[in-house]
Amino acid sequence: MDQAVILSTARTAIGKAFRGSFNDTDAPTLASHAIKASIKKSGVDPDEIEDVIMGAAVQQGTQGYNIGRLSAIASGLPTQVPGMSVDRQCASGLMAIAIGAKQIACKEMDIVVGGGVESISLVQNEFSNKYKSQDRFLLNNKPDIYMSMIETAETVSKRYGIKRDIQDEYALQSQHRTAAAQTQGYFNDEIVTVK
């Protein structure tokens, strides 16, 4: 089994859903900025890339229709480079990277682009596809299958006795750490400009 390594990383800044600077940016376009920057930093010849695996939790709108393939084309990769989409909700991007690593470790591929993209502003709005979006059999037999992330968090919190004030304290600590890291320039090499 081969060892998979990450040659380079890149990402866009995080925007504010519905009111930020990316609120009308299509998902393939958003992903392309990070993909192009990562490929450039890696020094890999785009012709050598064997797959683009992208994760997205809400695969509709411009995030639908195989976001991996759309991101590859938007990034200017050769048309022979295929793409693949992964939906594992919040872990979609991480799972895409893991799948790419497994392809390399199992000697199925040599060079893979993996990552995630989400444009909440363009998929969770008044135009979201909610028409018959839940299976009746599942609703009748396993009604919690469509539980939202917020409901899941509440359930986990109650089950394990994690109080709200402790969660808030942890979240605030995380925000402080992020702000400090940004101030100290720790993210400067990985965040790419989107114009």
Model-derived regions, located:
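Hydrophobic alpha-helical hairpins/lids featuring a short glycine-rich hinge
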Residues: 95-127
